[in-house]
Amino acid sequence: MKRKFTKTVLNAVFVLGLCSIMGGTSYAWDGKKDGTGTHALIAEHGLTMLNNDLNQNEPKPIKQNIEILNKYLKDLKLGSTFPDYDPNAYDLFQDHFFDPDTGNNFTLDNKWYVASPIYDTAETQVRKFATLAENEWKKGNYKEATFLLGQGMHYLGDLNTPYHAANVTAVDSPGHVKYETFVENRKENYALNTAGNDTTQGIYKDAVANKDFDQWMTQNSVKYAKKAKALYYSHSTMKHNWDDWDYSGREAIKNSQVCTAGFLYRFINEVSEDQISGNNLTNEFNVVLKTADNEYAGTDDNVYFGFETKDGSKYEWNLDNAGNDFEKNQTDNYILKVKNDVKVNTNDITKYWVRKENRTPISDDWELSNIKLISNGKVILQKDINKVFSGNQVYDINK
C-alpha cells in the first residue's frame, strides 16, 4: 500500500536495484510457465512415487482421491510453476526462501537488505496453499484445489533448494544461479519413481503420525530445509567442485521428490477423512483478501481486519505488506500475530470485520471481492463480500 511516500520510493529504488543484480528472479529450481521444468518434474514424480508405492489395502476414499489427483496432474504441474510467474508476486520472490534455524527469509536475516521486511516464507506459503487446496477439494472444486496444491508444492521444492534454505541469494553469491542451472540441466538424471517402500512404511508412515496437519506441515518443512541447508555448506558453494554439485543436486532433488510424495499422501489423507482439527487455540492467523477485477477497484487507503471474542476482547490488524496492496484483481495475504503471544480460542470468536480508513480527506474507494481466514491449517472463515467501501467504513461479518 502506498502509505509513506518517502519510504515507499526508497524501497522501490532499492528493490529495482536488486532486481538488476538478481535478474528479477529468485531462480530456485527452474519452472516454465507452461508447467514444465524442475518444479514440474518434482511434482509429477512425487505423484508417480505415491501411485507406485500405494498399498493395496488403503481405504477406498484414499484410492478414489488419488485417482482424482491423477486426473488433474496437468493442473498440479501448472500450479507448481505458477508462483514464479504470479503477477502479484514480491519483486525479489522473498517468500520463496526459508532458513529452518531462524524461521525467516533473507529480508530479516541478511544485513544488506534494508527495504521493508517480508514475513511470508516458503514454509508459511506451503501451509497457506495446502490449506486453501484442502478447503476447495472438500467443496468438490478439484481443478482449483489441485492448482493451489501445486503452488504449495512449489514452495516445498524451494525450501529443499540448498541456496534458499541457507538464505543465500544471487546478491550474496553468483553460485546461486550457477548451481541451480547446473541442476536444471541434469534433473532427468535425478528423477525417482518410488520411495523404496509402500505407504505403510517410511516417509508415508511418518507423514500421518502427527494428527495436527498444520503442525506436521511446519515440522516437515523444517526437517527438509535443514537437509537442504546442510547440503549448501557441505557440497553446494562456489568453493566446491562439479562432483560436489552433482552429489548435492542428486540429494536435493531426491529430497524434493520424497518430500513431495509424503506431502501428497498426507494431503490425500486429510481430504479423505471427515475430521475437524481439535486445536482451536492459536496466536497466529492468515487472512487472504481478493480485490475485485473492476476498474478503480483498488485503493491506497488504510485497510484493517479484526475480530471480537465472546468475552468482549477485540483484536485488529493494519493490513500493510511491502509494496502496493489492494490493487485491481490482486490477492493479498497477511500473517497476523496476536500481541504478546496471547492464545485465542477460535471457537470464542463472535464476529469479524473489515474496515477501511481514509488516508486523505478524499476517499479512495475499494471493492472487496472475498475474504478467507486460516487458522491451524483450516479455513475458519470464507465469505464473498462483493462490496464497495467508501469513506471510513466498517463491514461486519457475523460468524
From Swiss-Prot:
Protein's GO biological process: killing of cells of another organism
Binding site for Zn(2+) 1: 29, 39, 158
Protein name: Phospholipase C
UniProt-annotated location(s): Secreted
Cofactors demanded by this protein: Ca(2+); Zn(2+)
Signal peptide start and end residues: 1-28
UniProt-annotated binding residues for Ca(2+) 2: 320-321, 323, 325
Keywords: Calcium, Cytolysis, Hemolysis, Hydrolase, Metal-binding, Secreted, Signal, Toxin, Virulence, Zinc
GO cellular component term, pick one: extracellular region
Domain of life according to the entry: Bacteria
Reaction equation(s) it catalyzes: a 1,2-diacyl-sn-glycero-3-phosphocholine + H2O = phosphocholine + a 1,2-diacyl-sn-glycerol + H(+)
Domain PLAT, residue spans: 283-399
The protein's role, per its UniProt record: Bacterial hemolysins are exotoxins that attack blood cell membranes and cause cell rupture. Binds to eukaryotic membranes where it hydrolyzes phosphatidylcholine, sphingomyelin and phosphatidylethanolamine. The diacylglycerol produced can activate both the arachidonic acid pathway, leading to modulation of the inflammatory response cascade and thrombosis, and protein kinase C, leading to activation of eukaryotic phospholipases and further membrane damage.
Binding site for Zn(2+) 3: 84, 96, 154, 158
Region (Linker): 275-282
Residue numbers binding Ca(2+) 3: 299-300, 324-325
Molecular function terms from GO: phosphatidylcholine phospholipase C activity; toxin activity; zinc ion binding
Sites where the protein binds Ca(2+) 1: 298, 364
